[in-house]
Amino acid sequence: MVSRGCSITVLFRFLIVLLVIQVHFENTKAARHAPVVSWSPPEPPKDDFVWYHKINRFKNIEQDAFRPTHQGPSQGIGHKNPPGAP
């Protein structure tokens, strides 16, 4: 049989643990805020042809921008002294 002192000690320890857990969860509960959810309607799906046309248009601009101006190796690549170096 369990002595009365032992049962009181076990009960006291259980209450202390319960109190610590309650204090811990109460603090975390008070620190949390409800997340703000803003709902907006989804965008309509894009037309594949328009999307493809836009990509090609930008690629053509990039290709025109980097065309070499004259024949031969690129200036500054493969030379010990690139053009414009003192």
Swiss-Prot record:
The mature small signaling peptide is generated by proteolytic processing of the longer precursor. Induction: Slightly induced in roots by nitrogen and ammonium chloride NH(4)Cl starvation. Accumulates in response to osmotic stress (e.g. mannitol and salt NaCl). GO terms for biological process: cellular response to nitrogen starvation; nitrate import; regulation of leaf morphogenesis; regulation of root development; regulation of shoot system development; response to ammonium ion; response to osmotic stress; response to salt stress. Residues 31-64, 80-86 form a propeptide. Residues 63-86 are annotated as: Disordered. Extracellular signaling peptide that represses primary root growth rate. Promotes shoot growth and modulates leaf morphology. Regulates systemic nitrogen (N)-demand signaling. Mediates up-regulation of genes involved in N uptake and assimilation pathways. One of its GO terms (cellular component) is apoplast. Expressed at low levels in flowers. Present in lateral roots, shoot apical meristem (SAM), flowers and siliques. Keywords: Apoplast, Developmental protein, Hormone, Hydroxylation, Secreted, Signal. GO terms for molecular function: hormone activity. Belongs to the C-terminally encoded plant signaling peptide (CEP) family. Residues 1-30 form the signal peptide. Coiled coil: none annotated. Interacts with CEP receptors (e.g. CEPR1 and CEPR2). The modification Hydroxyproline is found at P68, P73. This is Precursor of CEP4.
